[in-house]
Curated annotation (Swiss-Prot):
This is GPI-anchored hemophore RBT5. A lipid is attached at N221 (GPI-anchor amidated asparagine). Interacts with PGA7. Belongs to the RBT5 family. Residues 140-154, 163-182, 200-210 have a biased composition (Low complexity). It is found in: Secreted, Cell wall; Cell membrane. Residues 26-137 form the CFEM domain. The GPI-anchor is attached to the protein in the endoplasmic reticulum and serves to target the protein to the cell surface. There, the glucosamine-inositol phospholipid moiety is cleaved off and the GPI-modified mannoprotein is covalently attached via its lipidless GPI glycan remnant to the 1,6-beta-glucan of the outer cell wall layer. Mannosylated. One of its GO terms (cellular component) is extracellular region. Disulfide bonds join C54-C94, C58-C89, C68-C75, C77-C110. Residues 183-199 have a biased composition (Basic and acidic residues). It comes from Candida albicans (strain SC5314 / ATCC MYA-2876).
Length: 241
């Protein structure tokens, strides 16, 4: 039964234009025996846990478009209608390293199942789509890096400008404040000196008047000065006030 299944696979694959079996190989012996059951399908089960999230739904493609038993890994690997559907889904949903990871896992599982090179047999159009998906991620990464670099330079320039503006404003404020404080100090000092001089002058005048008055009183009391002289002294004292 298994031999008939493998023979039908080889015949269908050849008719569909899939890579031919290398000459000299026996199509009945190149496929290892596989378990005749699968939780998803023979292609997905053994690599599902290692797939990137973007590809996990892709490997759940229906196997009804193929003559393969759903559990037959080798048969599914050589069916372009199944492999192509998986590949197109990956190209739409995955980018960059994710694409490379899926291709590597698919190649590995198909090689382990005994399929000949190129192992995972997808149409050329699907291969091109996968290549573009991988390249698109690389270009996006480069653009993102450039944008981040430009943003960082702009931010740095703005910070430098802000610091220079703040420094200039601080310097200007200091210059404006210094003359005002100096002028105020000078005015205060001048006023203090004027007040001190005035107080000194008043003190001296008071002292002189007191001295004169003392002399006049003493002379009057002694009775040694004529009345006219005493009157003149009193007039002189009065003039001082």
């Amino acid at each position: 039964m298994l031999a008939l299944s493998l023979l039908s696979i080889v015949s269908i694959a050849s008719a569909a234009g899939v890579t031919a079996i290398p000459e000299g190989d026996n199509p009945y012996t190149i496929f290892p025996s596989v378990a005749k059951t699968a939780s998803i399908n023979g292609f997905a089960d053994r690599i599902y846990d290692q797939l990137p999230e973007c590809a996990k739904e892709c490997v759940k493609q229906s196997t009804s478009s193929t003559p393969c038993p759903y559990w037959d890994t080798g048969c599914l690997c050589v069916m372009p209608q199944f492999a192509g559907a998986v590949g197109n889904c990956v190209a739409k949903n995955c980018k960059g390293k994710e694409v490379g990871s899926v291709e590597s896992l698919a190649t590995s599982i198909c090689s382990s199942a005994g399929v000949w090179e190129p192992y995972w047999m997808i149409p050329s159009s699907v291969s091109d789509a996968l290549a573009k998906a991988a390249d698109a991620a690389a270009e996006t990464t480069a653009e993102s890096t450039t944008a981040e670099s430009t943003a960082a330079e702009t931010t740095k320039a703005e910070e430098t400008s802000a610091k220079e503006t703040t420094a200039a404003e601080t310097s200007k404020a200091a210059e404006s404040s210094a003359p005002a404080e100096t002028s105020k100090a000078e005015e205060t000092s001048k006023a203090a000196e004027t007040t001190k001089a005035e107080e000194s002058s008043v003190a001296q005048s008071s002292s002189s008047a007191a001295d004169v008055a003392s002399v006049s009183v003493e002379a009057a009391n002694a009775g040694n000065m004529p009345a006219v002289a005493i009157g003149g002294v009193i007039a002189a004292v009065a003039a001082l006030f």
